[in-house]
């Protein structure tokens, strides 16, 4: 089964991707990781991608698709895979279709923007250990300091309310249209049409996991 997981930044895709991959025994395919590996290994595609990146440009969808096609030929993808971070745009989704890369199920983890802003802007981190707290859901015993060391906690730049709002705006502009695209593809009802399911992304991590696995029939 080939699966695409959609959802805004902070919706919990990373956590749930790990659960799905483990439960179904399929690899999680990260286009970013594959691109870095291809560049490091100096494969023909990696050299081409490095040339583009060194010139300050974005790697084209064509190169990304070629890297994906190479990855899908590997043995661990025979039973399927979970796409991580791809597609991000309708152009990329259409390219997958053109290349005949069939997607079986698209899952959208839906969380309201206000909840995501609360989730992310409330995070505080102890830099040395990586211990993470949340002002509302998992506060430190003493405000502003790590429970174990008493050292100050910080808010990462990525977690500031302003940054989160910007990331959400980009998501709604670029990636949200994919929901409409895949809803339409699912409605076609053809043999190569994916199923599309929206899963409520609030609640305990395990509850969300169970909703997703139920939707996938796992």
UniProtKB/Swiss-Prot annotation:
Its main location: cytoplasm. CDD domains: ADK. It is an enzyme of class 2 (transferase). It is found in: Cytoplasm. The keyword Ribosomal protein does not apply. This is Adenylate kinase. GO terms for cellular component: cytoplasm. Belongs to the adenylate kinase family. ATP binds at residues 10-15, 123, 132-133, 203. It holds the Pfam family ADK_lid. PROSITE patterns: ADENYLATE_KINASE. Keywords: ATP-binding, Cytoplasm, Kinase, Nucleotide biosynthesis, Nucleotide-binding, Transferase. The keyword Kinase applies. NCBIfam families: adk, PRK00279.1-1, PRK00279.1-2, PRK00279.1-3, PRK14527.1. Consists of three domains, a large central CORE domain and two small peripheral domains, NMPbind and LID, which undergo movements during catalysis. The LID domain closes over the site of phosphoryl transfer upon ATP binding. Assembling and dissambling the active center during each catalytic cycle provides an effective means to prevent ATP hydrolysis. It catalyses: AMP + ATP = 2 ADP. Residues 122-159 are annotated as: LID. Pathway: Purine metabolism; AMP biosynthesis via salvage pathway; AMP from ADP: step 1/1.
